[in-house]
């Protein structure tokens, strides 16, 4: 990599709640060369693989999944918060430190046997991505890899996703 991407991630203490060190990716996104480098790195990793789609998780996962899907010439499948998709959906509830949340994906988004990469911006505990992967598998599709811009290693999300091939660009 030509840019130190980690230098473009801003740390925001006590956001959104006290005790959280939020990783703000907006400086990286504002830097055209750095954003291009992220997409180019991901595209180089997945070019030539027999992929059918890139799955992006609302909302910041969309920032990376859409241009990557475009570059690879494959579909982009959005996984969204409840009530945002207009058609029949799979839904998976998952645990957070302070409660539960739910994600949805259109039932017809992926054909059985489709091969996908699931992308999100930050890996923390892994609950969100595990739920996304569960929906991909409910559709009969195959998770070829999970990928992240940032991995918060101290939260051990990678362990929760141990059954999937894994890639992260920046580790804290």
UniProtKB/Swiss-Prot annotation:
GO terms for biological process: adenine salvage; AMP salvage; purine ribonucleoside salvage. One of its GO terms (cellular component) is cytoplasm. One of its GO terms (molecular function) is AMP binding. SUPFAM superfamilies: PRTase-like (SSF53271). InterPro entries: Ade_phspho_trans, PRibTrfase_dom, PRTase-like, UPRTase/APRTase. It comes from the Bacteria. Pfam families: Pribosyltran. This is Adenine phosphoribosyltransferase. It is an enzyme of class 2 (transferase). Pathway: Purine metabolism; AMP biosynthesis via salvage pathway; AMP from adenine: step 1/1. It is found in: Cytoplasm. Its main location: cytoplasm. It catalyses: AMP + diphosphate = 5-phospho-alpha-D-ribose 1-diphosphate + adenine. Belongs to the purine/pyrimidine phosphoribosyltransferase family. NCBIfam families: apt, PRK02304.1-3, PRK02304.1-5. Keywords: Cytoplasm, Glycosyltransferase, Purine salvage, Transferase. Its EC number is 2.4.2.7. PROSITE patterns: PUR_PYR_PR_TRANSFER. Catalyzes a salvage reaction resulting in the formation of AMP, that is energically less costly than de novo synthesis. It comes from Roseiflexus sp. (strain RS-1). Homodimer.
């Amino acid at each position: 990599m030509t840019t130190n991407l980690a230098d473009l991630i801003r740390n925001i203490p006590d956001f959104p709640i006290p005790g959280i060190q939020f990783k703000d990716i907006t400086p990286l996104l504002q830097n055209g060369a750095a954003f291009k480098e992220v997409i180019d790195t991901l595209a180089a990793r997945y070019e030539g693989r027999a992929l059918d789609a890139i799955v992006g998780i609302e909302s910041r996962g969309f920032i990376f999944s859409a241009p990557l899907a475009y570059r690879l010439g494959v579909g982009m499948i959005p996984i969204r918060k409840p009530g945002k998709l207009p058609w029949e959906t799979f839904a998976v509830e998952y645990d957070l430190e302070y409660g539960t949340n739910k994600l949805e994906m259109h039932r017809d988004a992926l054909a059985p046997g489709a091969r996908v990469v699931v992308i999100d911006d930050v890996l923390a505990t892994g609950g969100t991505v595990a739920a996304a992967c569960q929906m991909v598998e409910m559709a009969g599709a195959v998770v070829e890899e999970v990928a992240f811009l940032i991995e918060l290693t101290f939260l051990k999300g990678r362990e929760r996703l141990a059954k999937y091939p894994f890639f992260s660009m920046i580790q804290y």
